[in-house]
């Protein structure tokens, strides 16, 4: 049995399914009327959550070096021709472990999963060989002074367990995004080699599209 690539829309990929889009592999976590929540299958880079001194809010995603990196990734995708509306804005709740909400809720086109989201979807997420950052702060400046960890950020270990680590540790960045359910993606299918869109000659494909448009 050989693996063949099949083209389909993201809406047809089951939750937990692996697919390829924009030259990257992702796992689909969930879907709603707005689109599909996906997570990078692999680590894109390894870096501190925030490097350097920031005595006020060192574990605030909004001020993090990770978000600067992800902003650059988004810019690279659009510069290479991917429409900006491929990346649907989604909200990230920055509530800390103790329930403090001073960091608020932010909206990005590319970001990180929260601790609560990881708790919901962990069964669907493939393990990787390096720990990776979540968006959730362990504590914030407004939390109880007896709560240690106002510089801590939650992360996922290689075995899938959760830890809180200092924001200047170097861990993996595994982006979360929201894609349209209509986005065309590629999936691997094990079976006898059969029809595969990639095998169709371009002229035949264009002719078929034209004929269907004229119907």
PLM features: residue spans?
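Collagenous Gly-X-Y triple-helix signature in extracellular proteins
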Residues: 1-205
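Residue-level detector of alpha-helical secondary structure
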Residues: 206, 210-214
């Amino acid at each position: 049995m050989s693996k063949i690539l099949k083209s389909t829309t993201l809406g047809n990929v089951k939750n937990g399914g692996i697919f390829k889009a924009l030259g990257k592999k992702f796992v689909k976590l969930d879907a709603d009327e707005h689109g599909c929540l996906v997570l990078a299958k692999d680590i894109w880079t390894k870096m501190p959550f925030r490097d350097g001194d920031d005595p006020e809010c060192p574990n605030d995603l909004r001020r993090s070096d990770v978000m600067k990196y992800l902003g650059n990734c988004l810019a690279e995708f659009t510069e290479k021709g991917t429409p900006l509306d491929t990346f649907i804005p989604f909200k990230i709740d920055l509530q800390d472990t103790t329930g403090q909400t001073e960091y608020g809720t932010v909206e990005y086109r590319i970001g990180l999963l929260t601790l609560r989201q990881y708790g919901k979807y962990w069964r669907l997420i493939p393990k990787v060989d390096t720990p990776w950052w979540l968006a959730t702060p362990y504590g914030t400046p407004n939390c109880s002074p007896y709560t240690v960890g106002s510089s801590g950020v939650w992360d996922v270990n290689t075995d899938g367990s959760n830890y809180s680590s200092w924001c200047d540790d170097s861990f993996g960045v595994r982006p979360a995004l929201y894609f349209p359910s209509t986005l065309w993606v590629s999936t691997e299918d094990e079976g006898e080699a059969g029809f595969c869109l990639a095998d169709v000659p371009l002229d035949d494909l264009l002719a078929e599209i034209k004929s269907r448009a004229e119907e």
